[in-house]
Design a protein with these regions (language model features):
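Glycine-rich flexible loops
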Residues: 1-257, 269
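Short C-terminal tail/terminal secondary-structure segment
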Residues: 336-339, 483, 487-501
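Substrate-binding pocket helix/loop in short-chain dehydrogenase/reductase
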Residues: 340-342, 346-351
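Active-site helix of classical SDR
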Residues: 365, 401, 409
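Alpha-helical segment proximal to the catalytic Tyr-Lys
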Residues: 370, 414-415, 484
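Residue(s) in the substrate-gating loop at a strand-loop-helix junction
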Residues: 385
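Short, small/polar-rich loop/turn modules that mediate ligand/substrate recognition or access, typified
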Residues: 417, 422, 486-488
Length: 501
């Protein structure tokens, strides 16, 4: 039994009822509902399942014998700065940060390289239900978009016109931003505020690409009319499907963050807080355990030696290639190798401390800047130390390195403000749940002040214990819109230190 398209829900139920009443439905193995799908039935579950397999297999065999998918090869290399620019434009049109997940599979690039792509990709969705996820059509992007990615604004304008053509009294227009793109020669892009949303759109795009091409070879790809798709897009039951989407009020929803020194302490806590606030978080650390640690707190861990410029460059590019850009960079990786005096300190300790704490911070910032220029609320947070202002004996290399990154951040704030990138410093002190504070390091520090370890832990003015979690929360707040007008700031989180004050 084959029935023409009608709206889903009660109208569809009534259509099927009217068609089958008065005759034996068992003479059919199933029902094909145009633009909905195939339905099989029986009083026996196994028989209904076997009927489905039979009908689908017949369709697969016919398509295999008669359908053709055009295989177009593309040798294009993706310009990641263009991808970041596209993401920023889409985020602006939607009014919130969006991920931009690019499918560069051979099949996706081949589809995007077709000569007729602007026509076949702009007719409508595979099934009208997809419209709530993908909108009616994707935006078609040039292989090398202009500086403003004008195709995005054109899409927005056309969506507004589409709404005006089809609206009825009482309807309020949904946001006009695209949810998917066909990027000429480069593949397809899914836009969303979560990885889950992007994955759903990517799956839909994958099925749609194949079906469009097979449909064209079998007589022509013909979706529903614009009006029929509009009616489903603005159908109250369809909108209810999206009503409970997670993360709408999260401070960093849809943002992309990189945190160094993420395998423990402040870095790990920062990753956990940012992820809880909706960000996609990539934690870097030389410790291989970073993968397991980040998985537990909702992020992705990557092994990286931040003193290796090639590794840093490669990983930043990889993050942008996967998620579409970069919004937050937290420079936390650091080391405190010993408590020796200047006289006793080895050259190796000095060189390693400066290399990890200062030079590596400069280089990761340098590698991140091109992408942060296209970030949404772009922010760099540098983790300094109380030692920048109040150094201690036996901590010369560490104190110099933290004074250095503080000056580096101040200069970066001056240089990057015209690009809308905020740069701020947080100065923690006595955060004892970090790897820096080994038992040996605590004993040495306490000895310098002629006090016990317990006394040393509580020697700040407020007499409070500073936890990594609280530093992470400060990082999250400072990189959020709450501090949209703050750059070049230095914020202590140390319980109060009389030498600093």
């Amino acid at each position: 039994l084959i029935l023409p398209y009608v709206m889903p829900g009660f109208i569809l139920s009534k259509q099927v009822y009217n068609e089958i009443k008065g005759f034996d439905i068992n003479q059919y193995k199933g029902i094909i509902l145009h633009h909905h799908g195939v339905f099989t039935y029986s009083n026996n579950a196994r028989e209904a399942y076997e009927n489905m397999i039979e009908l689908v297999t017949r369709a697969e065999s016919y398509i295999s014998e008669n359908g053709v998918v055009q295989h177009v090869e593309s040798q294009s290399e993706v310009n990641l700065l263009d991808l970041a620019r596209i993401r920023k434009s889409v985020s602006a049109s939607r009014g919130s940060a969006q991920l931009a997940m690019l499918d560069q599979s051979d099949e996706a690039k081949g589809f995007a390289s077709r000569d007729d792509i602007a026509d076949i990709a702009s007719r409508g969705p595979l099934t009208p239900d997809h419209v709530t996820r993908t909108k009616r059509i994707p935006v078609i992007l040039d292989a090398k978009p202009d500086e403003n990615v004008s195709e995005i604004q054109s899409f927005v304008n056309e969506y507004k016109a589409y709404f005006e053509r089809n609206k009825v009294d009482g309807l309020i227009m949904l946001d006009p931003a695209p949810r998917a793109a066909v990027w000429s020669s480069n593949g397809t892009i899914a836009f969303g505020s979560t990885v889950k949303e992007c994955n759903i759109i990517t799956d839909i795009a994958r099925h749609t690409r194949w079906t469009i091409q097979v449909g064209e070879s079998l007589g022509g790809w013909k979706p529903l009319s614009e009006r029929e798709i509009f009616d489903l897009e603005y159908w109250v039951l369809q909108q209810a499907k999206l009503a409970n989407d997670e993360g709408k009020d999260n401070a960093h929803q849809g943002k992309i963050a990189i945190v160094t020194g993420a395998a423990g302490g402040i870095g790990c806590a920062t990753c956990e807080v940012l992820a809880a606030e909706g960000a996609v978080v990539i934690g870097l650390d030389i410790d291989p355990d970073v993968k397991n640690v980040l998985k537990e707190v909702g992020g992705t861990g990557m092994i990286c030696d931040v003193t290796d410029d090639n590794q840093v460059h490669k990983i930043i590019d990889e993050v942008v290639a996967i998620y579409g850009g970069l919004d937050i960079l937290v420079c936390n990786a650091g080391t405190f190798l010993s408590g020796e005096s200047i006289e006793e300190m080895t050259n190796k300790i000095w060189d390693n401390t400066i290399s990890i704490n200062l030079t590596a911070t400069c280089r990761i910032i340098k590698n991140a800047i091109p992408y942060l220029k296209f970030g949404v609320g772009a922010s760099i947070i540098v983790i300094g130390s109380r030692n920048y202002a109040a150094p201690g004996a036996g901590a010369s290399a560490y104190s110099v390195s933290k004074a250095g990154v503080t000056q580096l951040a101040r200069v970066a704030a001056l240089e990057l403000a015209p690009d809308g990138i905020r740069v701020n410093v947080i100065h923690p002190d006595a955060v004892f749940d970090t790897k820096l504070w080994t038992k040996k390091a605590l004993q040495k520090s306490a000895k310098r002040y002629n006090i016990t370890v317990d006394e040393y832990k509580n020697k700040n003015l407020l007499g409070v214990e500073v936890k990594s979690q609280k530093v992470g929360e400060m990082v999250s707040a400072l990189s959020s819109d709450l501090f949209y007008a703050t750059t070049g700031a230095q914020i202590p989180i140390d319980g109060g230190n009389d030498r600093v004050i």
